[in-house]
A protein has these predicted regions:
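AAA+ P-loop ATPase mechanoenzymes
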Residues: 1-209
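N-terminal pre-Walker A segment at the start of P-loop NTPase domains
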Residues: 199-225
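Walker A/P-loop
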Residues: 235-265, 277-284
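Conserved nucleotide-sensing/catalytic segment adjacent to the nucleotide-binding pocket
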Residues: 263-265, 276-320
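Conserved nucleotide-binding/hydrolysis micro-motifs of P-loop NTPases
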Residues: 271-273, 296-299, 325, 329-335, ...
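Conserved catalytic/switch belt of AAA+ P-loop NTPases
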Residues: 299-349, 353
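Conserved AAA+ ATPase "SRH/arginine-finger" region at the nucleotide-binding site
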Residues: 346-359, 366-380
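C-terminal alpha-helical "lid" subdomain
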Residues: 368, 372-428
Length: 428
């Protein structure tokens, strides 16, 4: 096998299995090696494939799924160039085709002679593997299904050129690596630096699930539509009362625009100093990124807002056109302002400058969207809509009476308290 001749596709995650299998394919009938040792290595490879199936949720031909997964996750000059955009021009295509030819050889390898010589009939276990249907540790069911489907498509490809075309189409439709497969991400920081890691399971909420708030939702959609279409768009601040659907709206945006190349990266306040590093990792990718900050607010002694202002303003370097910042907050003005800020007896001689600095952060958001608490009539409409959606059977008069009792002791009139009331009824 020619695994050492790979040019573009290298440095695979979980790549050790590939090299072990390549060694077996090349030397299983070599008299120089002990047959029992080779069989032991083969069993170890079978174990690794089944272990990967458990972690990733693969089913069917596990060897084919493994190879497809390597190709889908390998970020290189060819795959990153093709993500979202499709086929690219240049000599890189020849280098990529060279590598796909090698993968085609791996894909079409006939294991029957190896199984006979090494006396390993158990290989049939991984040719038609049935998964436990449990949620995998690495992929959700949507991602797992796409990779297994890609593995099946490769089986129908007669040539390496066909296989390359199928793979390139996958890159165009979904992308490559973690950004291609996942919708949402968070930031981790360790001794090796800042990492953007996938959020495996997010709520499958849609904007239509949020009852009412048609004007705020339209304003949010219009700005996001412009962004994913490559037009000018603004950083966006969603503010207003607690429980009114601000965070749910952001989650809905992540779900509804994923197929059009939108990705969400959640950043917490203590991570603002890492924002420049995060942006440097995503600015040259062919996706649109929203950096999302939930429940954003600052006390008077906190200075993290200065990192955020610096990032939004961009400094000398032009802000990437594929990055926006969306934030939610219960405050219209994000930084707490005290009366003492306006007292002339303060040590700061330029009092107005101090006040303006604290107020200026909100002005960095070109679009501000207000989510107000519903009135009694709107709250009751939310309750009735949710009750119908979840098939709650209760006379309307009794339903609304109980809902009114519920909101009095559970945070007042809001979409959240309405949903909690319906959840309470469903759990009885």
């Amino acid at each position: 096998m020619r695994e050492k001749e790979l040019i573009v596709y290298r440095d695979f995650e979980d790549g050790e299995l590939l090299y072990d299998m390549a060694f077996l394919m090349s030397h299983y009938d070599d008299e120089y090696y002990n047959t029992e040792d080779m069989a032991a290595l083969f069993y170890e490879c079978i174990h690794d494939l089944i272990d990967l199936a458990g972690n990733y949720g693969f089913h069917g031909n596990l060897w084919h799924c493994y190879l497809a997964n390597l190709l889908v996750n390998n970020e290189n000059s060819y795959s990153c160039g093709c993500e979202i955009l499709g086929e690219i021009a240049g000599s890189i295509n020849d280098a990529a085709l060279h590598d796909i030819c090698i993968f085609k050889e791996f894909y079409d390898f006939d294991f029957a002679p190896m199984m006979e010589i090494l006396k390993v009939p158990e290989f049939s276990l991984i040719e038609n593997y049935a998964s436990s249907m449990q949620e995998s540790k690495v992929y959700n069911k949507r991602i797992c299904a796409r990779i297994c489907e890609l593995a099946e498509k490769f089986c129908a490809d007669g040539t390496a050129e066909d296989m390359k075309s199928t793979l390139t189409q996958f890159y165009k439709e979904y992308g490559v690596g973690k950004f291609g497969l996942h919708k949402s991400f968070r930031i981790t920081h360790d001794e090796e630096g800042v990492h953007i890691v996938p959020i495996l399971n997010i709520a499958h909420v849609k904007l239509d699930d949020l009852v009412g708030y048609e004007l705020p939702k339209k304003k949010l959609v219009d700005n996001t539509e412009a962004f994913v279409n490559g037009k000018k768009a603004n950083n966006c601040l969603l503010f207003g009362d607690a429980g009114t659907g601000k965070s749910s709206s952001i989650k809905a945006i992540a779900n509804e625009y994923y197929d059009r190349g939108l990705r969400i990266i959640e950043v917490y306040k203590h991570q603002f100093q890492d924002l420049n590093t995060v942006i440097s990792q995503i600015k040259n990718r062919n996706y649109k990124f929203i950096i999302y900050m939930d429940d954003l607010s600052f006390e008077e002694f906190e200075i993290e807002y200065k990192y955020l202002k610096a990032v939004i303003e961009g400094g000398l370097e032009k802000k990437p056109e594929n990055v926006l910042i969306y934030a939610t907050s219960n405050r219209r003005h994000l930084i707490r302002e005290n009366y003492s800020d306006k007292e002339e007896t303060r040590e700061d001689m330029h009092t107005s400058d101090t006040v303006q600095e604290k107020l200026s952060l909100v002005y960095r958001f070109g679009v501000t969207i207000y989510f107000g608490a519903p009135n009694k009539k709107e709250f009751q409409n939310i309750v009735k809509t949710l009750a119908e959606r979840y098939h709650v059977e209760m006379p309307e008069e009794e339903l609304l009476l109980e809902a009114n009792k519920w909101e009095l002791s559970h945070g007042g009139l809001s979409g959240r308290s309405a949903q909690q009331f319906i959840d309470y009824l469903l759990g009885k």
